[in-house]
Amino acid sequence: MAALTSIVLLAPVIGPLAGAGLMNFLHWKLLFAIIGAMSLLAWALLIFNMPETVTSQGRGFRPGEVFSEFVRAFKQPVVLTGALALSFSNLPIITWVALSPVILIDDGGMSRGAYAWTQVPVFGGVIIASIIVARFIKDPTSPRFIWRTIPIQLTGLLVLLAGNIAWPHTWWWSVSGTSLYALGTGLLFPVLFRFALFSHSLPKGTVSATINIVALSFMAASVEVARWVYFQAGGRIAFQCLALIAGIV
């Protein structure tokens, strides 16, 4: 579960960064061809290798039933609370990936190669967290473990904000604070996802889809809000205050 949810957390983060990096070496049409080929391969593998987990009841697909299940999921407070908690916890990382090229390359004068290396600790924090949860934590769903992850996240956000206020021209504080926050989020994300998925009797596929709908919609909106805050409402400090508020929420 920890590995799967870490993939869910990393995929929207690594994808845009990998695409931006590959555009330095490949034509954009070739990139679209690669994406299409990989999507076709994933579709074929799902058709031939996806295990069947639901016993057939001799009924066809009924859109009305699917819609009613989604309505029930959206009316479930645990599902919505979990989806919003996951979305807010992921916001500082997603907005950092979206705006860090502007902050570090355009405004900070960093080379693209150096910029790519600055993202390694951020992704490394999530990967290390998933390894810790999978290998060393016996009961990650215990309240004690959950409360122990929160100070890691808040410390990362405070390092991010305080370091940039004290040393505004040093990129190290942005990267180190975001990396520490990514470590805390990687520890907490699988637990929150599991709580939202299994704390009720609703169909798990519907609940997972509901969580992803909320999270992806929130992600798209948060990137636009963060972009406006950075360019129109105060620059880097205002942007990092937004990350701190999201982490606290």
Indicate residue ranges for each PLM-predicted region.
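Pair of pore-lining "gating" transmembrane helices in MFS-fold secondary transporters
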Residues: 75-93, 179-180
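C-terminal transmembrane helical hairpin of 12-TM major facilitator-type secondary transporters
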Residues: 144-190
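Small-residue (Gly/Pro/Ala) motifs that create kinks and tight helix-helix packing interfaces
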Residues: 11-23, 101, 133, 222-230
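Juxtamembrane intracellular "pre-TM" segments in multi-pass secondary transporters
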Residues: 51-82
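Structural signature of transmembrane alpha-helices in multi-pass secondary transporters
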Residues: 4-16, 42, 89, 122, ...
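Helix-to-loop junctions at the C-terminal end of transmembrane segments
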Residues: 129-144, 230
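A late C-terminal transmembrane helix in Major Facilitator Superfamily
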Residues: 193-232
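Helix-loop-helix hairpin linking two adjacent transmembrane segments in secondary transporters
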Residues: 3-48
